[in-house]
């Protein structure tokens, strides 16, 4: 078989093989969702999040009746390919929200000068995070009391940054954190602080879900969902607890262990131009 013949066969077979794999993947998720004891998992959908976080977040906001607001996301870059094009708050930007992104790596977006989204490049640690937060809020003309959603995912010192946010007086309606699913409840684990830490792929990173549940309880937050890949946990302020009476009370019925890298692309690949479009501030027509 010549090289050209092999290439022709490959080009014809690859789409069919990929489609078959996608169908198997969807069946895998459908089965997991059908077995979930948490009704919020049934709302999970991927649009611009890494996994099913978009759908879960939108359902939470629908329940607490927040249509417009402000977000604050720390850790929006996922490596070489997804620097600012795959994270938890893009969907909120597209719904008309305003927000702030912070990451130690530049994003692959060319944001307009007048933007609903402001990005700040900063590698955060306990010593610089408060100043970075306050500078970002001031430049974005947003008060910390106006932040509705916070998301933290930095693959390392997540707890120490999360702790700083809450101690600084942030009280978002919904707080999303990446947890370390390697440690099931009731295991308590929190990575020792290292201001220069960079994740190298091992399980020494972040916190166990039980550690986070115990911590957030001190600040008036309740765990309502873990996404189905065992990546992110959603905490909602107790002032909204009546909206989540159908959510399991036992952490073991909410926890998901790691089941990473299964979600397939939904629709066409993400374009930076699309996100830049939604970041533009458009003047409303005069009445």
Go through each PLM region and give its residues:
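Conserved acidic-Pro-Pro-aromatic motif
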Residues: 70, 89, 145-150, 156-286
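Polar/charged alpha-helical tracts
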Residues: 4, 8-12, 131-139, 167, ...
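Intrinsically disordered, low-complexity regulatory regions of eukaryotic regulatory proteins
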Residues: 3, 20, 51-52, 71, ...
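Short, functional N-terminal and low-complexity linear motifs
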Residues: 20-28, 101, 178-182
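Short, hydrophobic/amphipathic alpha-helical patches that form generic packing surfaces
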Residues: 22-24, 59, 213-215
